[in-house]
Swiss-Prot record:
Transmembrane segments: none annotated. Gene3D superfamilies: Phosphoglycerate mutase-like. The lineage of its organism: Bacteria, Pseudomonadati, Pseudomonadota, Betaproteobacteria, Burkholderiales. This is 2,3-bisphosphoglycerate-dependent phosphoglycerate mutase. It catalyses: (2R)-2-phosphoglycerate = (2R)-3-phosphoglycerate. It comes from the Bacteria. HAMAP family: PGAM_GpmA (MF_01039).
Length: 250
């Protein structure tokens, strides 16, 4: 049996402000740093150790990983950083407040933009300074692979090659792997691992800073999965994620 641990980055500044973040490179809040520290301490307390870790090129995920590994007394752990683990790109929605956007367009439309499997928001214009082609960290990525917007289907297509070429072979080689990434890149992995339907993935919400453990058989099929930590706290955090895209009630 193999084990894989997934963790969504701790609360970011734009999580706090309830804004669509996507590929915008915002940092963790103090709460987010504390979540990452507690995640690392929990993993250490439960006896987890890692041979290899992976994360995205966005600082909120990188810093979460650093802080968690520090709490594990394991900052020597080799880390693979790859853009394919980035958050889903939200196109023109990036930077907008989710509740204000819901008040303008309706809760249902925002839910579609946030969670529909195959519907993407309007793309960024090629000349928009937020377009990833203007960001030096993507300079070596072919321009036709850089998204101006994505739906979850696109995110799955981006993430799975990295799973197949890097993460899965490492697990099969017996390496204990930790992945610190984002809500939607992790939803992409979960959809693949659990064979979640296009309809059911809409209801999957991943809380920030909570380690999710997958026990996998020799074919990397899930035997079971579970969050570490307090069940009530995790349920409340999931509900909070689900409510982010709803208009505020007066």
């Amino acid at each position: 049996m193999y084990k894989l641990v997934l963790i969504r980055h701790g609360e970011s500044q734009w999580n706090l402000e309830n804004r669509f973040t996507g590929w915008t490179d915002v940092d963790l809040t103090e709460t987010g740093r504390e979540q990452a520290r507690k995640a690392g301490e929990l993993l250490k307390r439960e006896g987890y150790a890692f041979d290899l870790a992976y994360t995205s090129v966005l600082k909120r995920a990188i810093r979460t990983l650093w802080i968690a590994l520090d709490a594990l007394d394991a900052m020597y752990t080799p880390v693979g950083i790859n853009w394919r683990l980035n958050e889903r790109h939200y196109g023109q929605l990036q930077g907008l407040n989710k509740a204000e956007t819901a008040a303008k367009y309706g809760d249902e439309q925002v839910l579609i933009w946030r969670r529909a499997y195959a519907i993407a928001p309007e793309p960024l214009d090629l000349e928009d300074p937020r377009h990833p082609r203007f960001d030096g960290r993507y300079a070596k990525i072919p321009a036709d692979q850089l998204p101006a917007t994505e739906c979850l289907k696109d995110t799955v297509a981006r993430v799975l090659p990295f799973w197949n070429e890097s993460i899965a072979p490492a697990i099969r080689a017996g390496r204990r792997v930790l992945v610190a990434a984002h809500g939607n890149s992790l939803r992409a992995l979960i959809k693949h691992l659990d064979n979640v339907s296009d309809d059911d993935i809409v209801g999957v919400n991943i809380p920030t800073g909570q380690p999710l453990v997958y026990e996998l058989d020799e074919d990397l099929k899930p035997i079971r999965h579970y969050y570490l930590g307090d069940a009530a706290e995790i349920e409340a955090a999931m509900a909070a994620v689900a409510a982010q895209g709803k208009a505020k009630k007066d």
